[in-house]
Amino acid sequence: RQDQKGVLLGIYEVNHEHWAMDGAPWDYGMELFQEQVDRIENEITLGFERYPCLQEVGVKTWVNGAFTFSPDGNPLMGPVPGKPGYWCACAVMAGFLQGGGVGKSLAEWMIEGEPEADVYGMDVARYGKFAENKEYIRQTTGQFYSRRFVMTYPNEQLPAGRPLKMSPAHDAMSAAGCKWGVNWDLEVPLYFANKGFEETPSLRRSNAFEIVQRECLMVRDGIGLLDISGFSRFEVTGQNAEQWLNKVFASKLPKPGKSALAPMLSPTGRLKGDLSIFNWGDGTWWIMGSYYLRAWHMRWFLDQIAEGVGIRDLGEDYCGFSLAGPKSREVISQLSEGSVEELPFMGCGNFDIGLVRTKVGRLSVAGELGYEINCKMGDHIALRQILIEKGAEFGIHEYGFNALLSMRLEKSFGIWSAEFTQGYTPGMTGMDRWIDWDKGDFI
């Protein structure tokens, strides 16, 4: 761009170099570094070819300074999980462009309790402790920097910082043709394809479209199996657990052996989350939601925590599978040592599925007849094998989250952070139908 009577040429080089990975010195301010022309030779040559006049005039000033980046290039702001009273506003890459909005939102957050705008994409709690790993930071920030002017297509999966965490059945699912994406720190199934298939990213429908279409039809007309390790799970216990849940959630709490959809609101009545509550009937409750919101939800839960209430993130302990489709009841009825097939819609309970002790909910994000079957991490491989072997005679096939997301949209199941944000009220999303207006005080 023009810079007074000259031209300013900016470069994001592929051969980037990290600096101060342990943190910048406290006395560092606006200092510049010695130029390293050899490192940007390819990029500057392209610039000279694009603007031939630059080849004749020479370089007046070299500017080599530090940039601050997060793994996805967005700022890191807000209250830091696990550190009460500690706030941050870091990784503001474009200070002049973003600084005003970051400052405004942070001030509103501190004074009013929440920012006016939806700032989840900049919230420090969009990451978990896995992102504190220096190698993860090095890979992901380097990837973002080097791709600053590279087209990233919808649903394109990038390699940096992964694979990091995998469900126990990962290898068996890979052998079955699973193509993987990443959800927070976890590898999740996107779809299942023939050996050798490679997706070509596109601004239109990619060459994986027909594969995902087949998976949708399979679940609609028959039966499908989905790894739901990519759901979050929180356990709530204690003598005041029910009272606490009744305050934190706007819905009516489920009776023992039942589950319920539960909107969670901010003090101003805006949507804080859409989750499911399970009452297992033994004094323990589960909250289930989106896996990538684990730190975000836990921060809110701990902000509201009360005496006599314990809450635990089960994300490292539990995983599971979802059976969905009109034939799912036939399969599960032949495997359970209980009346799991008689569970009413939104019912839940503890059942033995083959050799595996499970916690089952009769619901499905796909919108079809379905069962969410939760198990301990150590039972994941065995549970998959049991379900596939028994489901074979019914034509069972595995499917991925691309199909699940498509089916939930067709069913009009919107979710927080995708279709809905913290700028929405329950009335704007249709979730007001789950609010219990007659119960006592709630947030």
Give the role of each language-model region.
Residues 11-12, 20-21, 420:
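Short conserved micro-motifs at the rims of enzyme active sites and ligand-binding pockets
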Residues 117-443:
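Glycine/proline-enriched, intrinsically flexible loops and inter-domain linkers
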Residues 4, 18-19, 25-165:
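C-terminal catalytic lobe of FAD-dependent flavoproteins
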Residues 4-6, 72-74, 83-84, 368-370, ...:
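Active-site lining segments that contact anionic ligands and/or coordinate catalytic metals
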Residues 1-14:
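Glycine-rich, aromatic-lined ligand/substrate-binding cores of catalytic
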Residues 1, 76, 274-276:
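Short, surface-exposed charged micro-motifs
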Residues 8, 76, 85-88, 286, ...:
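General beta-strand recognition
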